[in-house]
Curated annotation (Swiss-Prot):
It comes from the Bacteria. It holds the Pfam family PsbM. Keywords: Membrane, Photosynthesis, Photosystem II, Reaction center, Thylakoid, Transmembrane, Transmembrane helix. This is Photosystem II reaction center protein M.
Amino acid sequence: METTNFGFVASLLFVGVPTIFLIGLFISTQDGEKSSFYSDSGKGKLGPKR
């Protein structure tokens, strides 16, 4: 039982962490105009959306 429980937690972390990272990356890309890091590199893509 402990091994299956550990495998479940491990797989949950393995899937959950990259998912949270991708969601955060998507949100930061959507708000790229406000962020100084994305304002220069993403201006061509996010400019017309203004």
